[in-house]
């Protein structure tokens, strides 16, 4: 790797608009396409500082700076369009988190890279609405937080309480939310409001290792640790009244529940297993990449297909997982308010994934092409009238759920036609880290973080308080900056803003 002085690096970066920078070819070796990243002035400073720090002599660190990672992805075989960094981008394994890239399915050299999906396959967000208002929940929020904490298993080693044996797991991996529906954990209409209807049809549990299944079996219906949470939120601001009403959000003060979780240790194992296989495939097929972490395989190779089938099974696991937590959340609310989930109108507004690779059709250079779209820390955001979004949202565009961090706001956005053209129908997924986990632990004290939430009037239940500072708002970029940048750039549109009143965390 060549270390160039910072000013030389800057020659390859060009600001093309208030919210978008271009990364020219040559910034990293063998780039097949250009890169770009979306930022506002504050986020831009973070991106460039990260690059500047990596140019210092003797700068050794964990991951490469995000800008470099975007450019390395642009050098992968078969990539089309541009390698795109969204405003919440931060460096990660192989691909930066907040990087999306699309590969031409008809190009025999095109690759699939597990680093472009991430270890927590189908980590995603689900939003439930209620007909309760802040005034109904405020007096009982502590009990409600406790009740959710008791109902939903949380934390690193948490085990599920949804009864599950090995055969059930096989079926759940293949069927996704259809399994949850059959077992009575979700309502039929929940599926309609899920990306992929909660089931990837190419899932093949036979492509998943025993070890992954062993890790996954006890964890179904659990929240996990890290940035995963269940939050009781209040609608704070409505930017697009008409679209919000189509989602069942009529006015400020309405209570919603957001669940953010993924495929737990199961997805992690699937990714780990695939990386081992792909290293072999790269040697055999002589695939060169700029970064070892970008291990990949030709989409049409046995390894590529096996990974996509196992990844789909992990995605199904995550949908079943969020569905099980939906069930537990509905139970907790119904018990608290002495009624039924139905009477509380606890419908799923939408469920989106932000770590996944999917086959989609997009326009490239004026022609429609079949692409494998990698989204890592990036959310699908299809425009109005797109055939893959549910009937209820045909006129609004697909809802996009953007989770904030503990104690900060979350947003619902909608997809736009411009996003379809510029970013393959993708937008941001959250706040994006500004400090690494290790730095957060060194710089922040968990007691201060919890006190601050208390002062904000947020009830909190945490399984592992020592991990709290990793997730403190100070560790992240400002989610409002991120969402506003996407809105201003036109790749998604702001619809609703929510603020938390209770947080349940791993």
Curated annotation (Swiss-Prot):
Binds 2 manganese ions per subunit. One of its GO terms (cellular component) is nucleus. Pfam families: RtcB. InterPro entries: RtcB, RtcB-like_sf, RtcB_euk. The keyword Manganese applies. This is RNA-splicing ligase RtcB homolog. Ligation probably proceeds through 3 nucleotidyl transfer steps, with 2',3'-cyclic phosphate termini being hydrolyzed to 3'-P termini in a step that precedes 3'-P activation with GMP. In the first nucleotidyl transfer step, RTCB reacts with GTP to form a covalent RTCB-histidine-GMP intermediate with release of PPi; in the second step, the GMP moiety is transferred to the RNA 3'-P; in the third step, the 5'-OH from the opposite RNA strand attacks the activated 3'-P to form a 3',5'-phosphodiester bond and release GMP. The active site is at residue 429. PANTHER family: RNA-SPLICING LIGASE RTCB HOMOLOG. Catalytic component of the tRNA-splicing ligase complex. Its EC number is 6.5.1.8. Mn(2+) 1 binds at residues 120, 123, 228. Catalytic subunit of the tRNA-splicing ligase complex that acts by directly joining spliced tRNA halves to mature-sized tRNAs by incorporating the precursor-derived splice junction phosphate into the mature tRNA as a canonical 3',5'-phosphodiester. May act as an RNA ligase with broad substrate specificity, and may function toward other RNAs. One of its GO terms (molecular function) is metal ion binding. GMP binds at residues 227-231, 354-355, 403-406, 410, 429-432, 505. It catalyses: a 3'-end 3'-phospho-ribonucleotide-RNA + a 5'-end dephospho-ribonucleoside-RNA + GTP = a ribonucleotidyl-ribonucleotide-RNA + GMP + diphosphate; a 3'-end 2',3'-cyclophospho-ribonucleotide-RNA + a 5'-end dephospho-ribonucleoside-RNA + GTP + H2O = a ribonucleotidyl-ribonucleotide-RNA + GMP + diphosphate + H(+). Its cofactor is Mn(2+). Belongs to the RtcB family. Keywords: GTP-binding, Ligase, Manganese, Metal-binding, Nucleotide-binding, tRNA processing. Mn(2+) 2 binds at residues 123, 260, 354. One of its GO terms (biological process) is positive regulation of tRNA processing. It comes from Drosophila melanogaster.
């Amino acid at each position: 790797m060549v270390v160039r002085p910072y000013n030389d690096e800057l020659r390859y970066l060009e600001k093309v608009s208030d919210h978008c920078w271009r990364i020219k070819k040559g910034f990293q070796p063998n780039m097949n396409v250009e890169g770009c990243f979306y930022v506002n002035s504050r986020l831009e400073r973070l991106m460039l500082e990260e690059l500047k720090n990596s140019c210092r002599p003797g700068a050794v660190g964990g991951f490469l700076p995000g800008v470099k990672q975007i450019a390395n992805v642009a050098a992968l075989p078969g990539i089309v369009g541009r390698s795109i960094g969204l405003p919440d981008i931060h460096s990660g394994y192989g691909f930066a988190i907040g990087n999306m890239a699309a590969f031409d399915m008809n190009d025999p050299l095109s690759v699939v890279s597990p680093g472009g999906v991430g270890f927590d396959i189908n980590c995603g967000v689900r939003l439930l609405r209620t007909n309760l208002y802040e005034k109904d929940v405020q007096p009982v929020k502590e009990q409600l937080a406790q009740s959710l904490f008791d109902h939903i298993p949380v934390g690193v080693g948490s085990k599920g309480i949804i009864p599950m044996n090995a055969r059930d797991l096989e079926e759940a991996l293949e069927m996704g939310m259809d399994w949850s529906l059959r077992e009575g954990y979700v309502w039929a209409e929940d599926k309609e409001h899920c990306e992929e209807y909660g089931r990837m049809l190419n899932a093949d549990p036979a492509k998943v290792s025993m070890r992954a299944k062993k890790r996954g079996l006890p964890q179904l219906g659990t929240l996990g640790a890290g940035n995963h949470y269940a939050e009781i939120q209040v609608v704070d601001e409505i930017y697009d009244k008409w679209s919000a009403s189509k989602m069942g959000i009529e006015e400020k003060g309405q209570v919603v529940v957001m669940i953010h979780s993924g495929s737990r240790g199961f997805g992690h194992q699937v990714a780990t297993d695939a990386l081992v296989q792909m290293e072999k495939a790269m040697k055999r097929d002589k695939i060169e990449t700029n970064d070892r972490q970008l291990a990949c395989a030709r989409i049409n190779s046995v390894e590529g297909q096996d990974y996509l089938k196992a990844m789909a099974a992990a995605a199904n696991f995550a949908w079943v997982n969020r569905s099980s937590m939906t069930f537990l959340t509905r139970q907790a609310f119904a018990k608290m308010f002495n009624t039924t989930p139905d009477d509380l109108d606890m419908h799923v507004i939408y469920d989106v994934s932000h770590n996944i690779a999917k086959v989609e059709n997009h326009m490239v250079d004026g022609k429609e092409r079949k692409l494998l779209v990698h989204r890592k820390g990036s959310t699908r955001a299809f425009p109005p009238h797109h055939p893959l979004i549910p009937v209820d949202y045909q006129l609004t565009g697909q809802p996009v759920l953007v989770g904030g961090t503990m104690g900060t706001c979350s947003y619902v956005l909608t997809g736009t036609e411009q996003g379809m053209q510029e970013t393959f129908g993708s937008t941001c997924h959250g706040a994006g880290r500004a400090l690494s986990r290790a730095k957060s632990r060194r710089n922040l004290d968990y007691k201060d973080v919890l006190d601050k939430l208390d002062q904000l009037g947020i009830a909190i239940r945490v399984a592992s308080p020592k991990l709290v500072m990793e997730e403190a708002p100070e560790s992240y970029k400002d989610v409002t900056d991120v969402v506003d940048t996407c809105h201003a750039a036109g790749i998604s549109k702001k619809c609703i803003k929510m603020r938390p009143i209770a947080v349940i965390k791993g």
